[in-house]
Amino acid sequence: MITLAIPSKGRLKEQALEVLAKAGLAISLPGDERKYHARVEGLDNVEIAFLSASEIAGEIGQGAVDLGITGEDLVRENLADWEARAEIAARLGFGHADVVVAVPEIWLDVDTMADLDDVAADFRQRHGRRLRIATKYWRLTQQFFSQKHGIQVYRIVESLGATEGAPAAGLADVIVDITTTGSTLRANHLKVLGDGVVLKSQACLVASKKARTAGDEATLRDIVTKMAAAVG
């Protein structure tokens, strides 16, 4: 049995169902929307599970589901050593959003990550503390700042509410957040650094690297092939 997890609500659910239908995988939806399982018409060995996008990433990592439709940002953020546990089988062409580094607009001389590195080094001397970064993306932020750009002098602060409001509230100096149009960032007088795109994310079909029978593996690969063809 192959379990395919798709988002349980909203536009992501609608778009996931559209891609599945285009791939010839019509879903028999339950009459009761509170039910979280469905079947693929004509495929008795495939079960559909409706979960939140963040839950799907976790379930893929644990091997609790075989396939899932979720954001690439959630896979990379929520799964340690994700490439050993999952593979992105297809990018589906919807749910586009960028994880970005944004700073206050009034920082006129800060336009790149190199500029921000200078600010971070100077911050401790001027203010007696490290540069604070508000984000829900701890793993991606650490990889981008420390590993890719060599920035070490900073502190990540937990973002419990609307991340983009943290600098104005005095809770952080910089943010790393996900955005689709950038309008919310601009409304909060923030700007994205020129080389500050951490990840260009979209909805993906993700496969767990769990062990499975030859028959289940063949079914999984058939689903992947059909969905990849459907999105071109």
From Swiss-Prot:
* A single cellular component GO annotation: cytoplasm
Q: Sorted alphabetically, which InterPro entries does this protein's record hold?
A: ATP_PRibTrfase_cat, ATP_PRibTrfase_CS, ATP_PRibTrfase_HisG, ATP_PRibTrfase_HisG_short
Q: In which pathway does it act?
A: Amino-acid biosynthesis; L-histidine biosynthesis; L-histidine from 5-phospho-alpha-D-ribose 1-diphosphate: step 1/9
The UniProt record lists the EC number as 2.4.2.17
The record's principal subcellular location, in a coarse class, is cytoplasm
Q: What does this protein do?
A: Catalyzes the condensation of ATP and 5-phosphoribose 1-diphosphate to form N'-(5'-phosphoribosyl)-ATP (PR-ATP). Has a crucial role in the pathway because the rate of histidine biosynthesis seems to be controlled primarily by regulation of HisG enzymatic activity.
Q: Where in the cell is it found?
A: Cytoplasm
Full protein name: ATP phosphoribosyltransferase
Q: Which PROSITE patterns match?
A: ATP_P_PHORIBOSYLTR (PS01316)
Q: Which SUPFAM superfamilies match?
A: Periplasmic binding protein-like II (SSF53850)
According to UniProt, the reaction catalysed is: 1-(5-phospho-beta-D-ribosyl)-ATP + diphosphate = 5-phospho-alpha-D-ribose 1-diphosphate + ATP
Q: Which family does it belong to?
A: Belongs to the ATP phosphoribosyltransferase family. Short subfamily.
Q: Which CDD domains match?
A: PBP2_HisGL3 (cd13593)
- GO MF annotation list: ATP binding; ATP phosphoribosyltransferase activity
Name the UniProt key words of this record, in alphabetical order. Answer: Amino-acid biosynthesis, ATP-binding, Cytoplasm, Glycosyltransferase, Histidine biosynthesis, Nucleotide-binding, Transferase
Q: What's the domain of life for this entry?
A: Bacteria
